[in-house]
Regions:
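N-terminal/domain-start alpha-helical segments
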Residues: 1-120
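CheY-like receiver
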Residues: 118-130
Length: 130
């Protein structure tokens, strides 16, 4: 499974790469909005972990652009935890929203749940009647 992390905070980005790699995922990291948008559009990812506050363009703009052509799950991971931001993220197409600070175990559980749901939807949509 391949995950794209779009996170500008160096320590957190490196921590996520290390933890998710150790959990068996192939992980790419983008540190700006434009870089993340381009990787998400051009790459073949099973899931995106997306920060809101990014240099260049914010995570909401990245999400809206990616949603126009890609259907992979997106988990927004951000320090912006007010209700309006969570609602905006979910209405813009995010599949889940997790506020910083967070426990890595919760992030991993949410990623696994999103990937499970994604696989089930893919299996249903690719099923053909005999």
């Amino acid at each position: 499974m391949r995950i794209l992390i779009i996170e500008d905070e160096q320590k957190l980005g490196d921590y996520l790469v290390k933890g998710l790699t150790e959990s068996g995922f192939v992980v790419d990291l983008a540190r700006t909005g434009p870089e993340g948008r381009n990787l998400a559009l051009d790459g073949d990812y099973d899931l995106v972990v997306l920060d809101v506050m990014l240099p260049g363009i914010d995570g909401f703009a990245v999400l809206e652009t990616v949603r126009k052509s890609k259907a992979m799950p997106v988990l927004m991971l951000t320090a912006r935890d007010d209700v309006a931001d969570r609602v905006r993220g979910l209405q813009s197409g995010a599949d889940d929203y997790l506020a910083k600070p967070f426990a890595f175990s919760e992030l991993l559980a949410r990623i696994q749940a999103l990937l499970r749901r994604g696989r089930k939807l893919h299996e249903v949509s690719s099923y053909t009647l005999p």
